[in-house]
A protein has these predicted regions:
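Aromatic/acidic polysaccharide-binding cleft in carbohydrate-active enzymes
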Residues: 200, 261-264, 410-463
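Aromatic-lined carbohydrate-recognition surfaces of secreted/lumenal glycan-active proteins
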Residues: 194, 256-258, 302-312, 341-370, ...
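Extracellular and organelle-lumenal recognition/adhesion modules and their flexible linkers in secreted
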Residues: 1-234, 252, 269-283, 331, ...
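Structural preference for beta-strand elements that scaffold enzyme active sites
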Residues: 186, 191-193, 252-254, 316-323, ...
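An active-site-proximal structural segment forming one wall of the substrate-binding cleft
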Residues: 135-138, 143-147, 168-190, 234-249, ...
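Flexible loop/turn segments at secondary-structure boundaries
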Residues: 13-15, 97-101, 199-203, 261-266, ...
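Active-site groove signature of glycoside hydrolases
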Residues: 149-151, 159-160, 165, 195-198, ...
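Glycoside hydrolase catalytic-domain groove-lining segments
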Residues: 224-227, 231-236, 241-244, 331, ...
């Protein structure tokens, strides 16, 4: 959703340590590429805050007067679509090390030519200082960039660069792109599943989704490495913004909570990283989920309900579903599911709780995945069962009658993720075969989550 639904157009800010294969400076470069006396790197020195431990160090090594075209560029997500009828609200944090001169900030086109007014700020403060301004393009540019131009030799630090169009949804008061929210409203989803799939469990406890770290000012949100490289999560769409989006489009909210289990696929397929299911304090995860629910629907006299009100929303949010884990399965999962379900449903019995299923068992692709539930847990405690499918066009077409054979009176059906690989438009037609089977079996009370609802066409996963 970056540079799409969440309309902060620069690429991720430079904060997180390098994790696995991701580049912490993704989106940033210096210009001209052949030679420029301007160098950028990630630094841990003098961070903005305890939450925000990393920033970008700019080192200008020569007199910039001899290199008037030297720039630091942020290309956004494969280029910024700049429009003359929109102004762009700039904010960034700067800190001098030994730099005492202005820097100029402006927009450029694909060739690096200036296409907007210039915001000039003096960097003399050795403390982190926030600077703001407004940039207005002079022409439409499909793949523009944000340019930062040093004016002197020396070193300074940059962090949390933000560039929002002034016409976001809700009269510019939200972080959401107006036309996409309007399209979502027209699509009229009954619910929105958040934060989604693999973001929930990550590949270790650090990279799991921790909702409390996504609240408050963006500069205090640490963000996190994303399994879907090449970029990091900024968590600009945090836990609070998720519920705002649900309200904007008239959808119920489905929050997917972590169970303390990491991505089972990585445990199985990536032994070189020593991924393994870890021992965690399950009571802490249960309390965290209870806090999350309280933030969403708790009275303002409660701790987290009061926090929601402090963040501008005293009324409860439209939370209806809690999914316990994402693609977690096996005896360990069911043991945790039972404990989590008992604790959450005891306090919030009106919410709908959803269990996970194994993604794929070779040789049993056509089985009713729910038939193993009694082997692990009381079936009465599984009200809705989430099945995920990633397979070929041929397989999808064979599933047209799949749900006709499902046993009735068991858990309700939820297809939380469906990915059919193959060429367009045949993959869409094959997806339609499964959807027809779901609709034909309405007595299973089916739920279906589109995945993905949107994507950046220059960066496609699960093509």
């Amino acid at each position: 959703v970056k540079n799409g639904l969440y309309e902060n157009v620069p690429a991720p800010r430079v904060k997180e340590k390098k994790v696995f294969q991701a580049d912490p400076l993704i989106g940033w470069t210096t210009y001209p590429l052949s030679y420029a006396p301007v160098f950028v790197s990630r630094t841990e020195t003098d961070p903005m805050s305890e939450e925000n431990k990393y920033s970008m160090l700019v080192n200008v090594t020569e007199d910039i007067a001899n290199h008037p075209d030297a720039l630091i560029l942020n290309r956004g997500y494969y280029g910024m679509n700049l429009k003359t009828d929109t102004s762009y609200r700039l904010s960034l944090f700067l800190k001098s090390r030994n730099y005492s001169a202005p820097v100029r900030v402006f927009l450029v086109d694909e060739l690096g030519q200036q296409v907007s007014n210039v915001i000039e700020v003096n960097i003399e403060n050795r403390d982190w200082t926030k600077y703001t301004g407004e940039l207005k393009p002079e022409k439409n540019v499909q793949r523009g960039m944000l340019a930062i131009q040093p004016m002197s030799k020396g070193q300074f630090q940059i962090d949390v660069v933000s560039l929002f169009p002034s016409d976001t949804w809700n009269e510019g008061k939200s972080v959401f792109r107006k036309d996409i929210v309007q399209n979502l409203k027209a699509f009229a989803p009954c619910f929105i599943r958040f934060p989604g799939g693999c973001i929930v469990h990550g590949v270790n406890e650090e990279t799991m989704y921790h909702w409390k770290k996504t609240l408050g000012p963006i500069e205090n949100r640490p963000g996190q490495w994303s399994k879907w490289a090449p970029y990091y999560r900024t968590d600009g769409i945090g836990y609070h913004e998720f519920y705002e989006l649900c309200e904007y489009v008239g959808a119920d909210a489905m929050y997917v909570m972590p169970t303390g289990m990491i991505c089972s696929g990585w445990v199985k397929q990536s032994p070189q990283w020593n991924f393994r299911h870890i021992d965690v304090d399950l009571d802490a995860y249960i309390q965290d989920a209870l806090d999350a629910i309280e933030y969403a629907i708790g009275d303002t006299t409660t701790k987290w309900g009061a926090e929601r009100a402090k963040n501008g929303h005293p009324a409860p949010f439209p939370l209806k579903y809690i999914e316990i884990g994402n693609e977690d399965f096996g005896p360990v999962y069911w043991e945790r599911y039972e404990k989590i379900y008992q604790a959450l449903s005891a306090k919030y019995p009106d919410l709908v709780y959803i269990a996970n299923s194994v993604i794929r068992v070779v040789g049993r692709e056509n089985d009713d995945k729910r038939k193993d539930i009694p082997n692990f847990v009381n079936p009465k405690n599984v009200k809705v069962f989430d099945e995920h499918y990633y397979n070929s066009i041929e397989w999808a077409c064979e599933q047209h009658y799949r749900f006709d054979n499902y046993k009735r009176g068991v858990a309700d059906l939820f297809i939380g993720e469906l990915g059919i690989s193959g060429k367009y438009p045949y993959n869409l037609l094959a997806t339609g075969a499964i959807r027809m089977s779901i609709e034909r079996n309405g007595d299973l009370n089916p739920l279906f989550a589109e995945r993905p609802v949107m994507r950046h066409w220059d960066f496609l996963e699960h093509q």
